Amino acid sequence: MPICVLRKSPKRRSPSPKRRRSPKRRSPRRSPRRSPRRSPPRRRSPRRSTRRSPRRR
């Protein structure tokens, strides 16, 4: 029985890398959920750009 489990473990490890790539593609989709926390830093970036524009003028 344990031998069968050991044989199945390597087989499950092979698809694991492929499954790890999928979460990376879903990460952008999860970022919108964290956007509320990242929104403050993102709002500061546009404010800096607007402050630079009048200074250049």
From Swiss-Prot:
Basic residues biased stretches: 8-57
Region (Disordered): 1-57
Protein name, entry field: Uncharacterized protein 106L
Source species of the chain: Invertebrate iridescent virus 6 (IIV-6)
